[in-house]
């Protein structure tokens, strides 16, 4: 009984100390003593009046990077944000502009102690970089990188665009380029309203791509890939783990969709190759040849016009094909364990439909 009362006393004593400590922390934070927001800085660098060869920016923190038309007839770059006193002094001393003014290369200095458990919380917030160029000034190369921060890039027209972040989100919108390379190691990636031949590398995180024009290649580790409104000659999506969704797309040559573990759902024009080791495949609005393969999962494909070759294979799963009423083909269907329903073959055509499943029903109907 004595031990029980002692335990209760110790518990309440600890609770009181915790409450007192919490109140102290709250009061300290309310006074602004624990949260360090840094000192505001606005810094501008003048560029050449001629075309700009390259702009390169690197930072540890979140950054918004955008283009605006210059209204004063000059080309220049503006950096705004809150920084520590030491970083502010260091930035003001930087000279990132090349001698001829056509190149800009900056790595924003960062103090290492963002959080000290016995000191302050450093909350400097987001940086903003604005590139002011006259209407007739052209920018060749743009590179934006961050080690552990989010990146948001908007409204640029360049020849080459490169952007990457190790652990942070990457967003790019309203960008036009000959080539665009984007990469995230751990973070979501979002691209919208872009005209470029684009390549995307992701480690883990969701990828959302909307209204892209140009050839597209996506290689990823784990995370879903959603593509809407793409217009491309060639498209390739290959991920280790995650679903692939392709909607309202026009791929005139070939769309290759591959996931080791996940479903594939696509609606696009052009040839399609789809493969999943473990997951269902559903294709709709198809207007060209299809090859679909899965080790374990159903395959459902709907065609809206005559095509020459359809090849479907699944080890374990049902197959259902929906064809136009005037579709003509020679049908070859086989299942080791399952029912088979196919139309009558037409011997006066070279079009072929080949469907194989080890275990599952096959249904082909017009």
Regions found by a protein language model. Give the residues of each.
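N-terminal Lys/Arg-rich, disordered targeting/topogenic segments
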Residues: 1-7
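Hydrophobic membrane-insertion alpha-helices, especially the h-region
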Residues: 11-27
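N-terminal targeting/secretion presequences
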Residues: 14, 18, 133, 157-162, ...
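Short linear S-[DN]-x-LW-Φ motif typified by the pepsin-like aspartic protease active-site region
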Residues: 31-109, 116-162, 170-173, 190, ...
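Residue-level recognition of well-ordered beta-strand positions that form the cores
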Residues: 56-58, 66, 78-80, 107, ...
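A mature extracytoplasmic/lumenal domain signature
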Residues: 59-61, 69-71, 81-83, 108-112, ...
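Long, intrinsically disordered low-complexity tandem-repeat regions enriched in serine/threonine/proline
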Residues: 143, 164-166, 171, 176, ...
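Short, surface-exposed interaction patches in beta-rich subdomains
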Residues: 189-198, 204-366
């Amino acid at each position: 009984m004595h031990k029980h009362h002692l335990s209760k006393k110790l518990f309440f004593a600890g609770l009181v100390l915790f409450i007192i400590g919490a109140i102290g922390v709250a009061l300290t934070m309310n006074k602004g003593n624990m949260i360090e927001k840094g000192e505001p800085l606005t810094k501008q660098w003048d560029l050449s009046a001629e075309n700009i060869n390259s702009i390169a920016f690197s930072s540890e923190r979140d950054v918004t990077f955008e283009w605006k038309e210059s209204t004063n007839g000059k080309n220049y770059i503006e950096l705004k944000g809150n920084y520590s006193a030491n970083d502010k002094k260091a930035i003001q001393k930087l000279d990132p502009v090349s001698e001829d003014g056509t190149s800009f290369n900056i790595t924003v200095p960062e103090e290492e102690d963002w959080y000290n458990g016995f000191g302050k919380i450093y909350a400097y917030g987001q940086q903003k970089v604005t590139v002011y160029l006259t209407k007739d000034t052209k920018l060749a190369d743009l590179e934006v990188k961050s080690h552990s921060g989010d990146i948001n890039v908007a409204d640029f027209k360049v020849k080459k665009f490169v952007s990457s972040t190790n652990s942070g989100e990457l967003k790019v919108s309203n960008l036009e380029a000959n080539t665009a390379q984007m990469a995230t190691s751990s973070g979501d990636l979002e691209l919208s309203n872009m005209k470029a031949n684009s390549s995307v590398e992701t480690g883990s995180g969701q990828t959302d791509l909307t209204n892209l024009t140009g050839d597209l290649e996506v290689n990823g580790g784990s995370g879903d890939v959603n593509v809407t409104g793409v217009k491309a000659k060639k498209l390739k999506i290959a991920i280790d783990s995650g679903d692939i969704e392709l909607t309202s797309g026009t791929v005139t040559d070939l769309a290759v969709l591959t996931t080791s573990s996940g479903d594939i759902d696509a609606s696009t024009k052009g040839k399609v190759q789809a493969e999943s080791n473990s997951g269902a495949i559903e294709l709709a609005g198809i207007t060209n040849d299809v090859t679909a393969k899965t080790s374990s999962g159903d395959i459902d494909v709907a065609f809206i016009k005559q095509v020459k070759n359809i090849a479907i294979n699944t080890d374990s799963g049902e197959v259902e094909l929906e064809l136009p009423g005037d579709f003509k083909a020679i049908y070859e269907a086989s299942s080791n364990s399952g029912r088979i329903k196919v139309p009558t073959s037409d011997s006066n055509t070279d079009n072929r439909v080949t469907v194989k499943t080890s275990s599952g029903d096959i249904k082909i109907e017009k």
